Amino acid sequence: MNEPRGPDLSSVIFLMGFRQSGTTILSSVLGSIDGFTDLGEVHNVWGQRGRGWPKCGCQLRVNDCPFWGDIVGDPVTEDLQPSLAGQRGADPHDVERLRTDWVQQWRRSRLAVGSRTRSEKEIADRYVSLMELVYKRAAAKNGSVLIDSSKDPAYAAALDRIPGIRSHLIHVVRDPRAAFWSRVRKSHGGSGDDSALLATRFAGSWLRTNFLAELAMRKHQSGRTTRVRYEDFMANPAGVLLDISTMVGVDPGPLPLKGDTTAILRPNHTASGNARVRFKSGPVELKSDDEWRRELDPTGRRIVTVLTAPLLIRYGYPIAI
């Protein structure tokens, strides 16, 4: 469980969770601790290339970034020839289909629905080879603990298959009613357009993601897993950061906090993620957004509450508000 970290054993923290659950701010604050590096949502480095290289947290395009440039640049082609050769050819720049195949295959295997068009082993070997290269090249940059906030439990499952990686899974949860309001506000400009259908679909997606995250934690080979509530992190960031550092086995030294709830974010090289957070540096106040308690439409609130009640209770959230 707590094997010593040898020279070839890299540590990666993977943050799982539903959208609008706070994974980006948690990874940003963690990445501001000495010895930790926030990579952002690593899976999107490749998937976004068809629409042009995304902008790194340092404000340069990923392919021009001094951190990412030689990780995802042309030299990757030779390294990935063996693992990507076959049906998809040997073009490592078009890996979105591979990534999608892996996610769909893993979900089907866990939910026991649908038929498999390609073997799980074939898909896993190809995707794992790609991510192994990315993680190990990133670790070679500075040897620190890497943080991947890609959210989807399927990517966490792939991480668990990479040799030479000491992986840690963190399941980040947030009150689904708060997450739903964040989604409504973002999508509809705060108009309150949270119809019954939208609330029902949201609740179903929230339940599925968190159910799969729990499965990923149970299947994780090392048992190095924990759950963090967004609200607890906002209320006591120091306690959460220390707990995570203890799990990883790293002395964090001085925490990037000023006072109880102000984080001091340092410039980062996040490849993807919430732009409102990852492009920030300097002091950022950490506070839980309770606007949903006043603004969320009662119908949407009731639907989300009823449908997510089992996990609301499991995660310690009140049913009645």
Regions found by a protein language model. Name each.
Residues 170-171, 179-207:
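A glycine- and Lys/Arg-enriched "phosphate-lid" helix/loop adjacent to the NTP-binding pocket
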Residues 22-36, 159-164, 227-252, 268-271, ...:
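PAPS/PAP-binding and catalytic site of the sulfotransferase fold
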Residues 1-14, 19, 84, 106-116, ...:
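PAPS-dependent sulfotransferases, especially Golgi type II membrane carbohydrate sulfotransferases
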Residues 143-147, 167, 218-247, 291-295:
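Phosphate-binding beta-loop-alpha motif at adenosine-nucleotide cofactor sites
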Residues 15-17, 40, 146-148, 171, ...:
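Short beta-strand segments
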Residues 148-151, 159-184:
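Conserved phosphate-donor/acceptor-positioning beta-strand/loop module used by diverse small-molecule
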Residues 1-55, 208, 212-213:
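Conserved, well-structured beta-alpha core segment at the onset of a catalytic domain
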Residues 42-146, 285:
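PAPS-dependent sulfation machinery
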